Design a protein with these regions (language model features):
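Extreme N-terminal starter segment of soluble prokaryotic enzymes
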Residues: 1-4
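Active-site catalytic loop in hydrolytic enzyme cores
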Residues: 54, 86-166, 179-189, 256-259
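CN hydrolase (nitrilase-like) catalytic-core segments centered on the catalytic cysteine
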Residues: 57-78, 145, 154-241
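Short beta-strand scaffold segments in enzyme catalytic cores
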Residues: 78-80, 94-97, 137-139, 221-223, ...
């Protein structure tokens, strides 16, 4: 199974963002990817006051990525988008997965919301405008069990242990918009930790660059193997990186170091 992580600089123009995402998906398909992952909020990343009308799963964004997956014959984890939420004040931060035929295979709503107040540095209250999801999701991608997550979920290892131990995940995907000041110190460390402790591949696709005054995303999208080794990583700027997932290596690691089987708690 060949996976691609697609790194994007989404801004405040939904149509331009979708067009840029499509170019990255085409590059992933040209590189032989079976599965491509896009970043968090692929539809819009700009001032909250200018956010376009949130949509249902079968709205413009969902329909666009369904068509792209079908045209390219490739599985697509369409990052995440602003799904119409439970009330007028809240959206859901939702990841959609489409199969090669463009059919919706799974959807996941971000569970852990980024509520942070660091005086003089950052103030962000995601829960003010986003409702949390409640259900972990694992989807079967042609025999590869893929656990879904979004950005801030990465800091909560309990979710990933559940995806691996109860959901049987082989691959954990992380569409993200990790901020620069935390990404520099934590992004790679957390991704490699989730891979090692759950003996899973991890594919993380991040937003990159400036998006609005005061918000810069770290990028550095990567694929990590179950031993915690980085198989591929992107530098700054939009781009695509591909890696082949060796499931025989995954099985060997789990057999030689059976930490999942040895759990007591």
């Amino acid at each position: 199974m060949r996976v691609a992580v697609c790194q994007l600089n989404a801004r405040d123009d939904r149509k331009a963002n979708l067009a840029a995402a499509e170019v990255l998906l085409e590059r992933a398909a040209d590189g032989g990817a079976d599965l491509a992952i896009l970043p968090e909020y692929v539809d819009y990343l700009g001032p909250a006051a200018d956010l376009p009308e949130p949509e249902p799963v079968d709205g413009e964004v969902g329909t666009f990525f369904a068509a792209a997956a079908r045209r390219l014959g490739m599985w697509v984890v369409a990052g995440s988008f602003h799904e119409a939420g439970p009330d007028p004040e809240h959206t859901w931060n939702t990841s959609l997965v489409f199969d090669r035929a463009g059919s919706l295979a799974a959807s996941y709503r971000k569970i852990h919301l980024y509520d942070v107040e660091i005086p003089g540095r950052v103030s962000y209250l995601e829960s003010a405008s986003v409702a949390p999801g409640v259900q972990p999701v694992v989807v079967d991608v042609e025999g590869l069990r893929v656990g879904l997550s979004i950005c801030y979920d990465l800091r909560f290892p309990e979710l990933y242990r559940r995806l691996a131990s109860e959901g049987g995940a082989h691959l954990l995907v992380v569409p993200a918009a990790f901020m620069l000041h935390t990404g520099r110190d934590h992004w790679e460390v957390l991704l490699r930790a989730r891979a090692i402790e759950n003996q899973c591949f991890v594919a993380a696709a991040g937003q990159t660059g400036d998006h609005e005054p005061g918000r810069t995303c770290f990028g550095r999208s990567m694929v990590v193997d179950p031993w915690g080794m980085v198989l591929t990583q992107l530098p700054d700027g939009p781009g695509v990186a591909v890696a082949d997932l060796d499931l025989d290596r995954l099985a060997a690691i789990r057999a030689e170091l059976p930490s999942l089987a040895n759990r007591r708690l």
